[in-house]
C-alpha cells in the first residue's frame, strides 16, 4: 500500500493516483555574498556635478525627472558625504573599511561607469547661474532619495498620510544644515510623476547604499536617512516581526520557538535561520540585501514565513497591538489554526510577568535575600510523595513552560476557550478594520461565537 495514493471509483473503474500539488512556487535566494566582491551596479559616464545639479533640480521643478540621470547624479554626489569609519567594518568576509578610514557611501559598493553621456536637459528652464553649494547638493540628494520612501507607501494607508510624510520631509530639507532649493509641495508633485521609482533597480541600490552609510557614520547630513530608512530590512517583515515578538514577550529566540506547536513552522524556522547569513550582525550587507540586489525573492518576507507571521500577529492582536490588528493576514498559511495557538500564547504572556528583586540597599541584604530564596527553592523541590510534581506543573496554571501550554491546548481539544474568543472579539470590534487585516479576520471568524 502506497501511503501517498488515494483509491476511488470512476464509472465502476478503480482509480489509484497520487494527488500532487505545488507546495512552494517560489525559489528563495539567500543574500550571502560568496565571491568576496562588493555589491555592484553600472551607470553612465560620471557627470560634471554642477551641470548635473542644475539639470536635476530643473527637472524636479518641472516634475520631469530622468531616472538614469538621477542615478548618475546620486552616485557622483556621494563624494560630498565623507565620514570617518568608527570601527573595522567587514561583512560576509569583505573588508568595507578599516577603523579611522575616510569613507563615503561609494566606499561600501562598486559603481562601474560606461562612456555613455547622460541627457542633462534643463527641463524646467535655467534658474541657477552660479555653482551650487554643498548644502544645496545635500538637499537635492535628500529630496531625490525621499522619492524612494514615498513610492513604498502603499495605497492601503488612509487619508493624507503620504502628503503629511512628504510635508515633513520637505521641512527637514528646508532647515539647516540643509537649505531650501524647491517650492514647498514640489516633492509630492514630483512623486506623482515617478510613483514607482522604488522598482528601479539602480535607484533602489543607491537608496540602500546611502542608508547603509548614514546608519553607521555620524555625519552632518545624516538626516538624509529620512528618505532611505525603508531600505533597511526591506521585504523582511517575517524576520522583523519575529524579532519584535521575542522582545515583546521577553524571551530569547530559542525559548520562543519552543512554543511553536505546529508542523508547518519547521520549514519556515529552517528558512529564517539558514546558516551563513548575517541576520544578527550589525551594519552587515544583510540589512540592505534587497536594495543592493543580493536576493530576488526574500526568504524572510511575510509570505516566505507566513505561519510564523500569522501566529505572531494573532498574539499581538490578543495583546491589543494596533500594528498587529492592521497587518495583513497571510490567508494561505492556516490562519484559523494560528489564531488558536495565538490565543493560548496571548493569554500566557498578556497581563502576567516574571518579577524578582534585583536591587538591594547593601551587600548584606543581597546575601540574606539569596539565602532565603535558596531555602524556598529547596522546600519546593522536596517532593512529599503525594503528587507527581511534573503533573502539578501542568495543572496549576502558574507555569508558562512550553509543556504546560501545550498540555492546556490538548486538554481543550485544540480549540479556543470562551475567554480567548471574548478577548479577540473585544480587541477587534473596537478597531476600524482594514480589508484582509487581522482585525477583520477575528471579527468575521469569532464575533458570532462570543
From Swiss-Prot:
One of its GO terms (cellular component) is ribonucleoprotein complex. It comes from the Viruses. The modification Phosphoserine is found at residue 389. Phosphorylated by host CK2. Unphosphorylated protein N seems to have a better affinity for leader viral promoter encapsidation. Phosphorylation of protein N in ribonucleocapsid may stabilize the interaction with protein P, thereby playing an important role in viral transcription/replication. Keywords: Capsid protein, Helical capsid protein, Host cytoplasm, Phosphoprotein, Ribonucleoprotein, RNA-binding, Superantigen, Viral nucleoprotein, Virion. Changing residue 389 to D: Decreases viral transcription and replication. One of its GO terms (molecular function) is RNA binding. Displays a superantigen activity in human and mouse, activating mostly V-beta-8 subtypes of T-cell receptor. Homomultimerizes to form the nucleocapsid. Binds to viral genomic RNA. In nucleocapsid, binds protein P and thereby positions the polymerase on the template. Protein P acts as a chaperone on free protein N to prevent it from aggregation before encapsidating genomic RNA. Encapsidates the genome in a ratio of one protein N per nine ribonucleotides, protecting it from nucleases. If expressed without protein P it binds non-specifically RNA and therefore can bind it's own mRNA. Interaction with protein P abolishes any non-specific RNA binding, and prevents phosphorylation. The soluble N-P complex encapsidates specifically the genomic RNA, with protein N protecting the genome like a pearl necklace. The encapsidated genomic RNA is termed the nucleocapsid (NC) and serves as template for viral transcription and replication. This is Nucleoprotein. It comes from Rabies virus (strain SAD B19). The lineage of its organism: Viruses, Riboviria, Orthornavirae, Negarnaviricota, Haploviricotina.
Amino acid at each position: 500500500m502506497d501511503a501517498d495514493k488515494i483509491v476511488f471509483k470512476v464509472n465502476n473503474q478503480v482509480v489509484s493516483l497520487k494527488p500532487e500539488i505545488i507546495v512552494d512556487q517560489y525559489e528563495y535566494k539567500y543574500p550571502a555574498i560568496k565571491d568576496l566582491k562588493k555589491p555592484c551596479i553600472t551607470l553612465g559616464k560620471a557627470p560634471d556635478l554642477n551641470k548635473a545639479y542644475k539639470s536635476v533640480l530643473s527637472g524636479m521643478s518641472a516634475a520631469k525627472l530622468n531616472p538614469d540621470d538621477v542615478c548618475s547624479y546620486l552616485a557622483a554626489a556621494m563624494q560630498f558625504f565623507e565620514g570617518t569609519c568608527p570601527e573595522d567594518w567587514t561583512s560576509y568576509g569583505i573588508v568595507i573599511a578599516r577603523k579611522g578610514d575616510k569613507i563615503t557611501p561609494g566606499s561600501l559598493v562598486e559603481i562601474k561607469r560606461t562612456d555613455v553621456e547622460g541627457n542633462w536637459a534643463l527641463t524646467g528652464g535655467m534658474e541657477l547661474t552660479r555653482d551650487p553649494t554643498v548644502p544645496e547638493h545635500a538637499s537635492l540628494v535628500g529630496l531625490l532619495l525621499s522619492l524612494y520612501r514615498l513610492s513604498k507607501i502603499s495605497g492601503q494607508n488612509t487619508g493624507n498620510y503620504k502628503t503629511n510624510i512628504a510635508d515633513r520631509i520637505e521641512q527637514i530639507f528646508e532647515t539647516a544644515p540643509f537649505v531650501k532649493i524647491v517650492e514647498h509641495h514640489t516633492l509630492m508633485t514630483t512623486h506623482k510623476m515617478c510613483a514607482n521609482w522604488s522598482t528601479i533597480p539602480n535607484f533602489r541600490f543607491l537608496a540602500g547604499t546611502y542608508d547603509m552609510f548614514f546608519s553607521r557614520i555620524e555625519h552632518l547630513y545624516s538626516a538624509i536617512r529620512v528618505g532611505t530608512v525603508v531600505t533597511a530590512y526591506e521585504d523582511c517583515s517575517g524576520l522583523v516581526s519575529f524579532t519584535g515578538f521575542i522582545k515583546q514577550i521577553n524571551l530569547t529566540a530559542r525559548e520562543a520557538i519552543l512554543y511553536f506547536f505546529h508542523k508547518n513552522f519547521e520549514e519556515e524556522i529552517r528558512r529564517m535561520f539558514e546558516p551563513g547569513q548575517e541576520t544578527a550582525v550589525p551594519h552587515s550587507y544583510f540589512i540592505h540585501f534587497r536594495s543592493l540586489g543580493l536576493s530576488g525573492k526574500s526568504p524572510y518576507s511575510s509570505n516566505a514565513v507566513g505561519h510564523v507571521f500569522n501566529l505572531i500577529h494573532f498574539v499581538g492582536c490578543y495583546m491589543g497591538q494596533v500594528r498587529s490588528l492592521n497587518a495583513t493576514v497571510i490567508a494561505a498559511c492556516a490562519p484559523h489554526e494560528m489564531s488558536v495557538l495565538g490565543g493560548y500564547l496571548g493569554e500566557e504572556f498578556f497581563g502576567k510577568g516574571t518579577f524578582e528583586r534585583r536591587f538591594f540597599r547593601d551587600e548584606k541584604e543581597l546575601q540574606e535575600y539569596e539565602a532565603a530564596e535558596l531555602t524556598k527553592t529547596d522546600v519546593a523541590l522536596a517532593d512529599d510523595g503525594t503528587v507527581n510534581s511534573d503533573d502539578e506543573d501542568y495543572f496549576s496554571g502558574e507555569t508558562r513552560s512550553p509543556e504546560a501550554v501545550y498540555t492546556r491546548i490538548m486538554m481543550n481539544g485544540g480549540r479556543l476557550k470562551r475567554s480567548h474568543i471574548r478577548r479577540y472579539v473585544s480587541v477587534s470590534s473596537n478597531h476600524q478594520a482594514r480589508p484582509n487585516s487581522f482585525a477583520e479576520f477575528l471579527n468575521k471568524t469569532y464575533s458570532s461565537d462570543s
